[in-house]
Design a protein with these regions (language model features):
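Acidic/polar, glycine-rich intrinsically disordered N-terminal extensions of enzymes
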Residues: 1-77, 84, 225-227, 515, ...
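Catalytic alpha/beta core of large soluble enzyme barrels
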Residues: 3-6, 265-268, 307-312, 393-398, ...
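Alpha-helix capping and helix-loop boundary segments enriched in small/acidic/polar residues
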Residues: 19-22, 42, 66-73, 84-91, ...
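Function-dense linear segments that define catalytic or interfacial modules
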Residues: 32-39, 52-126, 134-137, 148-151, ...
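Gly/Pro-rich turn-and-neighbor structural signature
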Residues: 35-83, 91, 208-217, 221-231, ...
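Flexible, glycine/charged-enriched surface loops at secondary-structure junctions
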Residues: 42-47, 109-112, 152-159, 242, ...
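Internal maturation/activation junctions in enzymes
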Residues: 97, 213, 299-322, 347-424, ...
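Conserved catalytic alpha/beta cores of large enzymes that bind or transform nucleotide phosphates
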Residues: 131-141, 146-226, 230-231, 238, ...
Length: 589
């Protein structure tokens, strides 16, 4: 059984409850009823009960829009979409702004690629003026997001990408260095020829910038790379999208190209594609120090069916989005609480033993999810554009077990792609304050600073699992916080997980503030070919902006393991155990 308490309950009431009086069990019934309505009448009650069981027990937690909008009129249940990249015209500019506004007003984040836009200074047929360029259109879209943010319940979330070969790439790389520019968007460089780019960087070669074969010029690859590294080191942006790997791994390589990712980068998408997200709470499957793989497999199968049903009952912001979802039926089944799971099993996050377990777990989840989708194809039909023989030719499918590939070739598959790893920040707080996604725990303990009226206060907070272990007298020596891991530890975990995920992985590579930029650059270049997307964050490079727009110290300060153990024992002696809830809501995790 599960019932949110403390800060988890606050998140549920503030973010997801239908009314202030709605209970957790009532919300689970509401969601289960909505999603089971996609089933045939004879099966609806059966699957409503099954969905309720995995929701109410906190085995499976769907994306936030599913929690919030299920049961409402014309529910929009999907977290994110990607917009049309074709925008090199007056109509294209207008359509881009309109699509972003309409989608954002339903609560959907938007990914948008601008590589189709002619570069700054290019000629425009029939006009005397020169083209304003891709970055200028980004500024327009970002400006349109401000009133949507002010008028809605959620902050607008955008991803802007530009191809590495676009003539405006240098302007793009520096666009967010100006205060107040592109404040609603994450930005990422998209590279379709990553291996060639890496080779050019190492050999001090050049790459050609061009737009549709025009406006060609050459630039040293090292100049672009150094700018990417420097800006990411100092401001956590841009990210780098290895589109060569994305396309190589894509199961729909025979249908259409992918264009960019959703705002957090966990799903590379085709034009008008969507993120249909749900997460398995891994720590709930640890029983007597082992994973209950039978129960996990059952939940994976129900999770795939649940998310496939979401596509059937969803009300899409734009008709093109519905058409794309109907034709491809892409879903994003992921996990959360990986770090907690490792701790429960006695593994240190980033250790060799822990990584072997992650690899084994990834193989199990991917196989179970794909075979569940094949069973759905037998029952409900494969996705309409499925060509089973071509489907198994993708880079990802070639790594699947022979039996799984044979099943796909024989029956087709219900969902074109199935797996992802999303950040899961808020829904992880909802799920017992568990560790978020595949990230390490922030710290075994930390100080949280917050405002109470005009008074700045601080409280000591222990990670719930750390507190449980300490209270029970168990060893916590394998607990490790994000800041105590090496950069290679972070990258290696992401590399292992990416091999078992057909969509992509959203992970932040954390670095200490004094970490050498030269070391970051070498490791990034080493791991770049194996990761679809990378985002680095150096501690305190962005600061923390409070409600008055002022910069102050971040609200969370990590405490070392030894210090956490000492302060936990002291708090027990004095009867002042650290609070595990956030009274202010400032927590950004």
């Amino acid at each position: 059984t599960f019932d949110p308490q403390g800060f988890s309950l606050k998140i549920f009431k503030d973010r997801y409850a239908f009314t202030p009086e709605e209970t957790w069990q009532e919300a689970c019934q509401r969601v289960a009823h909505q999603i089971a309505s996609a089933e045939s009448p004879i099966k609806q009650k059966t699957y409503q009960d099954k969905f309720y069981e995995i929701l109410s027990s906190n085995y499976f937690v769907p994306g936030g829009r599913i929690w919030y909008n299920s049961g409402r009129p014309n529910p929009q249940l999907l977290n994110c979409f990607v917009l049309d990249p074709k925008k090199d015209s007056k109509e294209g500019w207008g359509d881009s702004a309109r699509a972003m506004i309409i989608t954002s007003m339903t609560g959907g984040g938007c990914g948008d690629d601008f590589s189709d836009v002619r570069p700054r200074g290019a000629t425009i047929a029939g006009q005397r003026g020169a083209a304003p360029g891709a970055v200028e259109l980004m500024r327009l879209i970002d400006a349109c997001a401000q009133p949507v943010r002010n008028g809605g319940q959620r902050r607008v979330a955008l991803m802007f990408s530009l191809d590495l070969s676009h003539p405006d790439i240098e302007e793009f790389l520096s666009a967010k260095l100006v205060k107040g520019e592109l404040t609603h968007a994450n930005i990422s460089v998209r590279s379709r020829h990553t291996k060639a780019f890496i080779k050019a960087v190492k050999e001090d070669g050049e790459i050609e910038l061009h737009w549709k074969g025009q406006y060609k010029r050459s630039i040293k690859a090292r100049i672009l790379w150094d700018t990417i590294v420097k800006n990411a080191y100092n401001s956590a942006e841009p990210g780098f999208l290895n589109w060569e790997l994305v396309e190589h791994e894509s199961n729909i390589h025979y249908i259409e190209e992918l264009v960019t990712t959703n705002p957090c980068g966990e799903i590379p998408l085709e034009p008008f594609g969507n993120c249909c997200l749900g997460h398995i709470v891994l720590s709930r499957f640890v029983v007597d120090g082992e994973i209950d793989y039978a129960a996990l497999g059952d939940t994976i199968r129900l999770g795939v069916r649940f998310l496939d049903n979401v596509l059937s009952v969803n009300h899409f912001p734009l008709p093109q989005m519905k058409t794309k979802a109907d034709n491809l039926r892409r879903i994003g089944l992921g996990t959360t609480a990986l770090a907690d799971t490792l701790a429960l099993l006695g593994y240190r996050y980033g250790s060799e033993e822990g990584n072997k377990f992650i690899d084994k777990l990834g193989r199990f989840i991917s196989k179970a999810a794909y075979e569940a989708s094949v069973l759905l194809a037998v029952e409900k039909g494969p996705f309409p554009l499925c060509h089973s023989m071509k489907h198994v030719e993708s880079g990802f499918m070639k790594r699947m077990p022979a039996k799984t590939k044979s099943l796909v070739m024989e029956h087709g598959i219900r969902n074109c792609m199935l797996l992802t790893q999303a950040p899961t920040g808020t829904v992880s707080i909802l799920s017992e304050n568990c560790s978020s996604g595949i990230e390490p725990m922030f710290a075994p303990a930390y100080e949280r600073r917050y405002w109470e009226g005009d008074e700045r206060k601080m409280e000591l907070v222990f990670h719930p699992l750390f507190a449980k272990f300490m209270s029970e007298g168990k060893s916590v020596d394998h607990f490790v916080g994000s800041q105590e891991l090496t950069v290679r530890d972070h990258l290696e975990v992401q590399r292992i997980i990416q091999r078992h995920v057909d969509n992509a992985v959203s992970k932040t590579i954390n670095m200490p503030h004094d970490y050498p930029v030269e070391d970051m650059e070498k490791l990034w270049l080493e791991y770049l070919p194996y990761l679809k997307g990378t985002t680095f964050y150096r501690e305190s490079t962005r600061g923390f902006i409070n409600a008055n727009g002022e910069v102050e110290e971040p609200p969370l300060k990590a405490i070392s393991l030894d210090e956490a153990k000492r302060r936990f024992k002291e708090s027990h002696k004095t009867g002042t155990e650290g609070v595990m809830e956030c009274p202010s809501g400032v927590c950004s995790l």
